[in-house]
């Protein structure tokens, strides 16, 4: 919808108390960009991208891979000026994710509800739903990869190498720490002091494939989807 701050996208028709300005919410924003980038009118998502980093939006209220989303919008509309304008803000956003949600393990943690997944089995096993989740860690890997690509586009080659190194390191951590070898599946490690995998195989365990994180032999995780 058109607002005084330009076009925004909302998933709600009635106003809801958990949404932000103009009834926006960052929870599904990545999906909005991936689907909306095919719209012929590029102004809609260009405005929407700027909205999140204009001071009006709250891009970290929920898990939201903003750099990845905006980079994939760029691949369709080739709006280099938008990338150049938002790059410093996307860098700052990623740095804040690192500051707020990454700890000494090198992994990111998130609350299941803030992942946009309501209450979960793995969240029930932790303190306040917190855990090292394949979701947020995959999103942050995607952010680092996207920032590396954006940095190259705006001629920041040294920064591109820095972000690619961050991505490579996180990819290794995801594959070592969040892959349950007994279950052949990516799982949540609930934040409850035990550093043990949740007993549940949750659909979120397939999210790393969206970002091409798993090695080929991890494809065994898909076997149960086709096991009649």
Residue ranges and their predicted role:
Residues 55-64, 98-166, 179-207:
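The feature captures the catalytic groove of carbohydrate-active enzymes
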Residues 1, 41-54, 80-98, 139, ...:
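Extended, well-ordered alpha-helical scaffold segments
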Residues 74, 177-178:
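Calcium-binding motifs, dominated by EF-hand helix-loop-helix domains
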């Amino acid at each position: 919808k058109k607002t005084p701050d330009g076009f925004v996208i909302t998933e709600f028709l009635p106003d809801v108390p958990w949404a932000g300005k103009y009834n926006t919410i960052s929870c599904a924003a990545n999906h909005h960009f991936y689907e909306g980038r095919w719209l012929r009118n590029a102004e809609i998502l260009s405005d929407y991208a700027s909205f999140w980093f204009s001071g009006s939006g709250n891009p970290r209220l929920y898990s939201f891979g903003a750099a990845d989303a905006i980079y994939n919008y760029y691949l369709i509309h080739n709006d280099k000026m938008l990338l150049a304008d938002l790059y410093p803000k996307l860098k700052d956003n990623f740095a804040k994710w690192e500051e707020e949600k990454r700890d000494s393990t090198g992994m990111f943690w998130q609350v299941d509800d803030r992942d946009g997944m309501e209450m979960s089995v793995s969240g029930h096993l932790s303190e306040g739903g917190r855990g090292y989740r394949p979701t947020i860690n995959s999103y942050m890997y995607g952010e680092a990869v996207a920032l590396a690509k954006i940095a190259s586009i705006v001629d920041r080659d040294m920064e591109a190498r820095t972000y690619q190194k961050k991505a490579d390191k996180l990819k290794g951590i995801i594959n070592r720490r969040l892959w349950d070898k007994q279950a052949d599946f990516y799982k949540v490690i609930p934040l409850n002091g035990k550093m043990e995998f949740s007993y549940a195989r949750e659909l979120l365990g397939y999210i790393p494939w969206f970002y091409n994180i798993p090695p080929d032999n991890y494809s065994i995780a898909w076997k149960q989807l086709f096991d009649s």
